[in-house]
C-alpha cells in the first residue's frame, strides 16, 4: 500500500497505468477482467438548496453548459436535477422537493456540497459486489433504468462522511462516449430547451477540461483509515504523502495523503488536521460541515491557465489572494529545478496565479474562495506542464492566504 507508482514525465496524468480517457495519455495493457477498473469520473453530484438557481451560478461564473434536467415535468417526484457539462466535466445539481427528502435534510445540516463522486465502470453490479466483498458499506443496491434509447445501471457504496461513490455502467445511446459528447444522459432526463447562457458560454469558453483531483477532509486521526479503505475497497495506490513539516505556517498545519486509482482516472487526496497554534483550514471546514468529513475541493484541469483564470475573473469568480512579494522569488525557485515557465510572467502575477515545479515539470494553479456562504467547498483551477505534483512549493503562501480569509471570517 505504501509503494508509489512509476510516473511518466510526458503524460498529463499520473500513473504507470494510463487512462485512454485523458488527453495525451498512452494506451497500455490493463486487466479488462477487473470489475473495479474505472474508465472515468461519470459525474459529480451536488446537493443544493435550489438547483435551478445553482445552475445559473455555475453556468455564469464557471462557463458550464446547462444541458439536461429531470423534475416534476419529467416524472421525478422527489428531486429536481440539472446536468451541467464543460469539456469532460459533468456536474449534477440536485435539490429535494420535499422537506423529508435526504437532499433537503443534508443541505439543512451541511449546506450545499458534493454528495456523490460517480465512477464509470463496465458492469456497475459486478463492481458494487466486488467493493462490498472488499469491505465497503452499501449506499444502495443496483438499480437498472432502461428505455428505448438504452440502459443505465447504478449502485453505490459509502465513503467518508456522507459521500457516496456510485458505480455507473452504460449501454446504447447512454454509452460513455455519447455522454462525453453531450448525448443523452439516461432515462428520465430531458434536453434543456433555450437556456440563455449556453450560447454565450459556447462563444466565451472558460476552457475547463476534466477533474484533475478531488480532495476530502476528515477528522484528526482518520486519514490513514480512509487511505486503507481506498486501497482495500477500490484498489487505489498511495501516490504522495505530505506531513505537517510540508504543510504548515506559523499558526496551522495539516497532513495529506494522495490516493490514485491506478488507471489514471482520478486522484483523491485525503486531508486531516495536525496540531497548530490556531484553527486550521481543515478544522474550519469540519466545524462548518457539522463535524462531518466531506469533499473540500474539486481541481479542474485546463490547458490554458491564463485564459481560464482571466475569463473566470471577468465573470466574477473570487480567488484567494497572494501578496505580490510571492513573485519576487518564485521564478528563480522554479528555474533552480530546471524549468523555464513559458507563460507570460507579468500576466501570471497580474492574475495572481501560483507556480510550482518538480523534477518532471511545472504547474500553474489558483484556488477560488468558497462557493457558498459556509467556508466549505471550493474549486481549484490547475494546468500541468509535466509536473505531477500538487504545488508543494506553494503550500506556505497558499495556507497563509487561507488563514487571512479565516481571520476575516473570525475562524482562525
What are these regions (language model features)?
Residues 2-6:
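Acidic, Ala/Val/Gly-enriched low-complexity intrinsically disordered segments
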Residues 7-17:
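Short, Lys/Arg-enriched N-terminal segments with co-localized hydrophobic residues
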Residues 17, 36-39, 45-90, 133, ...:
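Core segments of cupin and vicinal oxygen chelate
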Residues 17-52, 114-117, 179-227, 291-301, ...:
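N-terminal beta-strand motif that seeds the catalytic metal site of vicinal oxygen chelate
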Residues 22-23, 35, 39, 48, ...:
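C-terminal functional regions that serve as terminal interaction/effector modules
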Residues 41-48, 64, 84, 91-93, ...:
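Short, structured motif recognition centered on aromatic/hydrophobic residues
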Residues 68-80, 92, 97-116, 121, ...:
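A cross-kingdom feature marking solvent-exposed beta-strand/loop segments within repeated
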Residues 112-117, 133, 139-250, 255-257, ...:
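Extended catalytic-interface subdomain
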